[in-house]
Each structure stands twice: as structure tokens, then as C-alpha cells.
Amino acid sequence: MSMGSNFQESFQKALCSMEEGLNGLNSLVEKSVFPDDDEITSELTIPGPKRIFYVADAIRKGWSIEKIYSLTKIDYWFLDQIKELIDIEEKLYDSNIEELDKDYLQEIKEKGFSDSRIAEMIGVPEDELREHRKKRNVYPIYRRVDTCAAEFETSTCYMYSSYGGKCESNPTTKKKILVIGSGPNRIGQGIEFDYCCVHASLAMQEEGYESIMVNCNPETVSTDYDVSNRLYFEPITSEKILDIIDIENPEGVIIQFGGQTPLKLADVLSDKGVNILGTNVDAIDRSEDRERFQELVNKLNLKQPTNGTAKNQREALKKAEKIGFPIVVRPSYVLGGRAMQLVNNTKELEKYLNEAVEVSNSKPILLDSYLTDAIEVDVDVVSDGINIEIGGILQHIEQAGIPVSYTHLRAHETRGNLVCRLLLE
């Protein structure tokens, strides 16, 4: 969900919030290379998850609003709003950064264009565009959500960004901590991450800090009005987080409880001098980079399945052949089971590498020999580096590595003392 001062702003903020690699109303393909007419006609006629992007690409390709309406029956008002965004986009592609004066920047920011999207279209780094925008004195303002539909006067600390008008944020001078939420729920990043953020916020308040929550999911506990002292309902992007940090000036930012969504901002926040509380950026990278993590496991001489890391498709296929199928493939910089897959042969691995994941020097993948008939156990622990407290032991009822029906696997009983013994080893 997103909020803004107009449809175009809200629409583009919503697209940025989806965590689908979008920074606005992106094209489905590279600029000037569009789907063929038959594909567009089919996608416009039959509603689907990518329909709105086909609407935009049809406009980019020169289709009339009338033709698009006849296929989609989307109201003309919405189609005109989208066309206006495409018109601005075409103008931006022909612009350079010096042509973006204060009035022009203000206009396009009011229509929801993100710094990342603008920078992409004019061909400059996002950081350069951000600094240019600030030099032109174009900043977001924050409006408070009226939770009573104007029936009577109320003051909430529930805010969203916009451009133009009076800022209603009124930040305090109290000591404060900002907690970055988990954004949209999905496989591998579920509600448990949100609940961690909730407890982080409550703990900060108990310690005498003003807690600030940033999230964009209305279906979570973290966006309840009484969980934090101040709530910003915003996309979890570097632009939005840095803007909030600029106005609130927190003593520190917590990123480790929201899953992969805030963790991917670790480097940019650290580079900007933001004080990241808890697990440091290097430790986060060591646990998320499959190659670095593998080096640590080997150094500690821990037991593990036969495995290997790969930085390109050729290397992955070669190591898979050496390990032997079936194997479990995991990308770097993801949590939970997202983009993790069990592959049984070379053909399945090639499909996975081509369609499901990006493999590069900076994003190696891990290939593990799949353990058949294995029991999977989760152990939650807290340690100060010397002492270990076990918070809970959870045995999976499904086969390790892949969800299957309980009836396909006999019930097991794992004793807590066995787990403790293995931990001590």
C-alpha cells in the first residue's frame, strides 16, 4: 500500500514498494524494444499481474488511449494519468541533469518519480541525482494521516511523504531509534520478521527512546498506531529511508529484524555514515555472501554437506556435476527459502540459473548436496560470545529442503539434549 497527494504519486510509490525490482512504472523490456502487438493485445484483454505494465508499454509503443480502453475497459481517467507519466518519461530520456531546475524537479517529484528512476532515465548515478535535487532545494514533506475522516480534530504520528505543501512531521528533539520494517510479506520473509520489528520498537521505548517505524504493509502489526511513537508509511528504499533520517536525525538505525528488505540497504546506509545498531555491516555481508560464509564454515571446521560456490553459469554446472544430483541451490543475499530450489538434473539447473537468480562475482550461489531422509531442526540461540542461551528448538515435519505432505515422511522425535550435544561439538 502507498499514500501520496495524488494518484500518480501514490501509484508509483506503490510500484516501488512491491520489491519486484521496480523503481517506478518501468517498462517490461529495454527502452525502444517492446512486446509484439499480439502479446500486448492478449495481456490487455485478459487481466493478469503484469497488465498495468503492458498498458504503459502499449502507450510507449504509440497505441491510442481509445484502443487500450477498448481492450481493458480501464477508465479513461486512469489511462490519461498513465499517459502523462509516459510523456514525462520521454522528456526525461532527452534531458541531462543540468536541465533539471527546481521547478521541473518539483513537478516530476510531485508525480511520484523516484530518484532512482529519474537518474536511470537521464543516465547518472542515483547519488548524483539526489545531491542535485538537494542543491535545488527540492525536499519531501510529510503529511499526517487523518484517521477520523475529518469528523473531528485529531493528531496522529502516522505519516507519509509527498512534495509540495506544509510539512506536518514536526520531529521532536528526543533521543530516537529508527526501525526499518520488512515491507511486503512473501515466501522466505513472513510475518515473523515483522513481529521482530515490533518487539524491537517496544524495547526501544522501554529503554527511554522514541521509536520510529518505517514500513509499507498495512497487514502487519508494525504499522499499528500504538506500536511505535512515530510511523512512516513509505517504500523501503534507500531514498525514502535517507529522507526520513535527514528529518528525524535518529541516534541509530536497526536493520537486522526486518528480513532481507532492510538488510539490502546496509551498504548504502553505512556509506552515508548512518549508525547501524546491532550486527555490523561486515558481519551481515559475511553471513549473506555465500562464498564468504562458506569460508567461515570451513575455517571453523563445521560439518556440512558436500558443496561448492559458483560465480557464473559455467562454473555452477561444472561444480554440480562434481557434487552430484540432487542438489540444493541457494543465491546470495536472500533469507528463508526465497529463490532456493532443489534441482535433480542439469536441465533443471540451467533453467534455474537462467530464470530464477542472478549469478555474478558479487552474487555467488551455493550448491549443496541434497541430504535425503534428513531431519531438519531450527535452533534459536542468543550468545554474548561466550555463553549461549537456547530460546527454542523446532523440528520440521516435512522433508528437509522441500515442502511435502506429512504423510510422506514418518514422524520423528528429536530430543533436546541431542541438539545441545551437537551444539557443544
Which residue stretches match the model-derived regions?
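Phosphate/diphosphate-binding loops
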Residues: 105-130, 235-257, 359-376
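Flexible hinge/switch segments at interdomain interfaces of large molecular machines
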Residues: 29-35, 267-270, 394-406
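Terminal amphipathic helices with adjacent charged low-complexity linkers/tails
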Residues: 5, 9-50, 56-61, 67-152, ...
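Buried hydrophobic positions in well-ordered alpha/beta secondary-structure cores of metabolic enzymes
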Residues: 10, 68, 118, 183, ...
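Rossmann-like NAD(P)H-binding beta-loop-alpha module
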Residues: 305-341, 370-386
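Conserved ATP-binding module of the ATP-grasp superfamily
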Residues: 300-305, 322, 326-329, 342-372, ...
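ATP-binding N-terminal substructure of ATP-dependent carboxylate-amine bond-forming enzymes
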Residues: 131-137, 143-302, 311-318
